[in-house]
Amino acid sequence: MNVLFVCEDNSALSIMAESILNSVAPGRFGAYSAGCYPNEWLNAHALEFLAQHRMPLANSRAKSLELFRRPGAPRMDFIITLCDVAADAQFAGWPGDPFIAHWHVETDDATGDADDVLRDNFWTLMRRIKIFASLPHGKLNRRLLERRALTLRPSYL
């Protein structure tokens, strides 16, 4: 099963989510990330944090959402948006009719400490992705699986 994590710029949140899923469920999922408006660079603090936690970083580069709409792109089973900009993106008519879920991850912090926000986001994503990966994919019908995936939204965690 293929999962595409989408955020605004594909520089931190979606890169972390891709890396986490590849780490917690190797071989079970194809994890990908993209941005609605991808940066030219990745967040150096996010990459450093992932490396410190021994998370895989293969193919880590900012990618456009449009890359995954093209013919020959991997067929997505799930598209998970991580910010409001990504949630507003148009996924109607996406090839393969993937299930779309929005897991808003808060990126603003009143203290202004970017490292604290990054750390909190990493552990929030880790919890949600571990639960997502533990769902019996392939054994539940699509509607039941979709309902369970939706419970991973912030109001439930």
Give a label for each model feature:
Residues 24, 32, 42, 52, ...:
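Short, surface-exposed, charged/polar-biased interaction segments
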Residues 78-83:
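Acidic beta-strand-to-loop metal/phosphate-binding motif
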Residues 89-157:
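Phosphate-binding/catalytic loops
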Residues 9-11, 84-87, 107:
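Short glycine-rich anion-binding loops that position phosphate/pyrophosphate groups of nucleotides
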Residues 1-69:
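Conserved active-site segments centered on acidic
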Residues 74-75:
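Alpha-helix C-terminal capping/helix-to-coil transition sites in glycosyltransferase folds
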